[in-house]
Amino acid sequence: MSGGEWLEGVARVTGVRILIWHGYLLGGTGSNVYTRELARAWSRAGHDVVVLCQEPRPERFDLGGARVVRPRLDGPLPVFVLDRYEDARPKLLGQLSRAERERFVEQNAAAVRAEGPADLLLTNHVLLGGPVGAASGLPYVVKAHGSELEFAMRGDPALCAWARETLAGASAVLAGSEHVAGVLDELVGLPSTSVRIVPPGVDVDRLRPRPRTEALAGLLAESARDEPNPPERHDERRPDDGNADRLRAFLAGDRPTVLYVGKLSAEKGVGLLLEALRKVDARAVIVGFGPARAELEAAAGPDVLFTGPLEHRHLAHLWPLADVSVTPSVFPEAFGMVAAEAAACGSPPLVARHSGLAEIAAGLEQEYPAHLRHLAAFERGDADDLARRLAELLALSPDDRAAVSAAARRAVEKRWSWAGVAQSILAAASRGALGG
């Protein structure tokens, strides 16, 4: 049976066995959330799902019944950007020795084989998802996320050649946006016509507009549930200590609120947002962790609150409280999931117009009233343009604000629900069999 035939069968039925290989965690950054939500959507659709990843505490997450297997690692964890991990030793992919790379691939491939056979193996990231899939001996589909392309493969011909070799054996290659497909063509020589575009998804049942009183009460209740995280043993990957009291005080009153959710690193443009906020009468909540936090917090004024990273149980209540959600990245983004999630909650996103974020903006603009379409995006790296559009969004009349909020939600329901995305991946995989 060819790759196309067996994948077509997967797309037609339920109750099949699906393996998802993901080299990292299940919380925090975009590909982690992607893996978690896809596993849950497929599980809820009646499939038998196993997630192979490095998450040390999977019980914290609702995976809809999916099982988690953690492959044993004897060496370092290959990463694209250095972060701290609870019980893994990260090392930049480009700095790994050949022996370290081969050991990582084989240990993960062995874990995949032990869970086989499967109707579908989905591996995340061109590297190292492609090599792990190829070494597993199972038919595999590779999902490109973007971070591996920009932070590891760009400028490294050897890594690009390795990716090209392992993608050749994939049944299909998926990307979340036309931008990522274009980068794949640029770096690997894989024509964009060979890549199937399936945008990431949003849990539209959990992430929805809520009345302010309900949303604030829910946010404070979830924050009160957080485990202690005192300064003397602070874990940057967990919410800050005392967030419930801090948020209660900070969000008192009806002053306009701007929200940022994402990593705190230079390429995410948070400094640009802080610069723009100095020209706007608003308060801002900054959610996330990363190497630039101390510098950003020192540069922020009293109208800005940093919370550390929050989980979706918090964000489901925080996004509805935000008058605007800003995604100011200055570096290419594969898609911009947090912008879509904000839109699902009725919080109008304002995104930098480039890469995958431009595709988010295009989806919003198709739903926005004509006279408000210019408020979906701003010019990358332009703090003045960001400030102007942010001020205009915050000054909308009640009718226009309601129209933009409803349109943002509608854009997500039409394009980016997880249930639809999960089925689209199966269908795209069946259509995209390479050489099958």
Model regions: which residues?
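A conserved catalytic-core segment of Leloir-type glycosyltransferases
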Residues: 14-15, 51-115
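A charged, aromatic-enriched C-terminal amphipathic alpha-helix characteristic of glycosyltransferases
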Residues: 30, 381, 395-429
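Carbohydrate-associated surface elements
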Residues: 55, 179, 201
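Acidic donor-binding loop of glycosyltransferase active sites
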Residues: 171, 258, 320-334, 347
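Conserved donor-binding/catalytic core segment of Leloir-type glycosyltransferases
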Residues: 174, 217-268, 274-278
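Nucleotide-activated donor-binding/catalytic signature segment of Leloir-type glycosyltransferases, i.e.
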Residues: 255, 286, 294-314
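Short alpha-helical donor nucleotide-sugar binding micro-motif in glycosyltransferases
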Residues: 309-310, 318-322
